[in-house]
């Protein structure tokens, strides 16, 4: 009873600390936003050679159906969308580019070119970054922005992000705001990674003394570790002067790939004997193909982000096979192992939903998997404390 009360006390302290940090971040961001007005583009857009359509706030514009051309005038606005005034000459506007290239055109001026894929910014700069654009036009002058997406998968929402993230640039305030916006997610990522390192350390010790649980600990530690690095990479804001754009993208993609693999391996090792061979065989094929894709990118000019679409197909098939086996296997296990199997089933369903959701523009990135993982991770920590 005393141990449980102590554990509940620790949980309470952690929750209160987290609430205080969240409250501070929210209040501080409100103060900073007063200095950085948003920028809206009032006008129209077209995809490829299609018809011009009005730009409507909150309406999805696909980045995967061809080049997108935006045309209209730039206006400063409050975060709620209320227009303040047209953007004036010699103002600095910041754009967020999610694997996009393009240019800004105005009558009588040379095109203003930006491209995250060319060598002007750095070698192999495939990734996300912020770009500062010096507006030289008159107030309410028509600008035309042409955006190109070199990828076939992964950044379906890039145009939406481009439009919603435009804001006035003020040196110092912008950088501080971006850092604080992602501080919470980075802290979560670092905490998860730290726990993973501890688990891997326990796995190493267990292997040395030949405990049966060592293999499970290795797979669990690896899956948790790459989940942590994913959160850190996803929260990394790359500014115009930061030359680590490609590195951040590589860590981001590898984290997703390796988390998926080790989650599958962890799931397979918990199967009952009739299903273990099928699970191991599935993961062996998945691991071999994943390794082949990584080797291919090493010895070719193909970027890691471009094999993401192929890996997604592989991961969908792998997750579907493991999901079917897990649903059958759950009938043969009892007690805590049944609960563990249900946890794996939920994780596999979340992964499949993320793949489909990203492909068809329902939501962005690993939304389901991230939420499911965080809930399961902290639930597991609390369960350990209560034991």
Residue ranges and their predicted role:
Residues 64-85, 130-131:
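Short beta-strands within extracellular/lumenal beta-sheet-rich domains
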Residues 82-106, 143-145:
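Aromatic-lined ligand-binding clefts that engage carbohydrates, nucleic acids, or primary amines
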Residues 104-160:
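Beta-strand-rich ligand-recognition modules
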Residues 1-63, 146-180, 208:
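Accessory carbohydrate-binding/adhesion or oligomerization-edge regions at the termini
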Residues 199-229, 272:
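Juxtamembrane interface at the cytosolic side of transmembrane helices
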Residues 228-269, 273-387:
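Interfacial "cap-and-anchor" motif at the non-cytosolic start of specific transmembrane alpha-helices
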Residues 170, 176-210, 309-330:
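First transmembrane helix
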Residues 59-70, 117-127:
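Extracellular beta-rich ligand/substrate-recognition surface
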């Amino acid at each position: 009873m005393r141990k449980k009360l102590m554990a509940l006390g620790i949980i309470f302290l952690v929750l209160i600390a987290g609430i205080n940090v969240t409250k501070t971040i929210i209040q501080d961001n409100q103060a900073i936003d007063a200095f950085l007005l948003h920028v809206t583009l009032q006008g129209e857009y077209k995809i490829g050679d299609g018809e011009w359509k009005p730009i409507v706030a909150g309406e999805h514009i696909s980045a995967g159906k061809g080049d997108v051309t935006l045309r209209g005038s730039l206006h400063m606005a409050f975060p709620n969308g209320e227009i303040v005034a047209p953007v004036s000459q010699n103002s600095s506007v910041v754009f967020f580019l999610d694997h996009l290239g393009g240019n800004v055109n105005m009558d009588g001026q040379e095109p203003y070119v930006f491209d995250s894929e060319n060598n002007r910014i750095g070698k192999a700069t495939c990734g996300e970054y912020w770009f500062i654009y010096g507006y030289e036009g008159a107030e309410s002058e028509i600008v035309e922005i042409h955006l190109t997406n070199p990828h076939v998968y992964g950044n379906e929402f890039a145009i939406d992000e481009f439009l919603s993230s435009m804001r006035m640039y003020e040196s110092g305030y912008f950088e501080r705001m971006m850092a604080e916006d992602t501080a919470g997610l980075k802290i979560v990522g670092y905490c998860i990674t730290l726990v993973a390192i501890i688990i891997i350390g326990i796995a190493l010790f267990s292997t040395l003394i030949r405990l049966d649980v060592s293999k499970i600990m290795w797979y669990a530690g690896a899956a948790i570790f790459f989940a942590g690095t994913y959160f850190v990479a996803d929260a990394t804001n790359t500014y115009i002067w930061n030359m680590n754009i490609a590195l951040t993208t590589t860590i981001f993609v590898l984290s997703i790939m390796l988390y998926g693999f080790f989650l599958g391996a962890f799931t397979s090792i918990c199967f009952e004997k009739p299903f273990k061979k099928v699970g191991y065989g599935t993961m062996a094929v998945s691991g071999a193909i994943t390794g082949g894709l990584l080797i291919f990118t090493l010895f070719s000019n193909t970027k890691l982000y471009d094999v993401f679409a192929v890996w997604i197909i592989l991961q969908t098939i792998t997750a579907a096979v493991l999901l079917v086996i897990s649903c059958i296997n759950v009938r043969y296990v009892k007690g805590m192992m049944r609960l563990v199997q249900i946890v794996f089933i939920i994780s596999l369903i979340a992964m499949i939903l993320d793949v489909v959701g990203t492909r068809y523009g329902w939501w962005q990135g690993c939304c389901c998997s991230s939420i499911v993982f965080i809930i399961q991770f902290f639930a597991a920590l609390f369960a350990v404390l209560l034991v």
